[in-house]
Amino acid sequence: MEFMSKEGYDKLVSELNELIKVELPRVINAVAEARDKGDLSENFEYHAAKREQSRLLGTIRFKQNILAHARVLDHSSL
């Protein structure tokens, strides 16, 4: 369980939305463009884009997991 402030929770939600709505489509597009350039076995751009996609998906899953187990602290009750 992750304890966090409302501000911290909102910031994490905002970061996650940015990753899903902006960064992920950009990376998916980069993978598709690199794939169209031909032979994948020697295509550095494709492999770099796939590594970036994998890293990004891991970050998204990590943040989703934190939010799924987050408990927002109410400062007024402390």
Where do the model's predicted regions map?
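N-terminal cationic and glycine-rich segments that engage phosphates or anionic surfaces
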Residues: 1-17, 21-51, 55-61, 67
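Glycine/charge-rich, flexible interdomain linkers and switch-proximal surface loops
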Residues: 43, 70-78
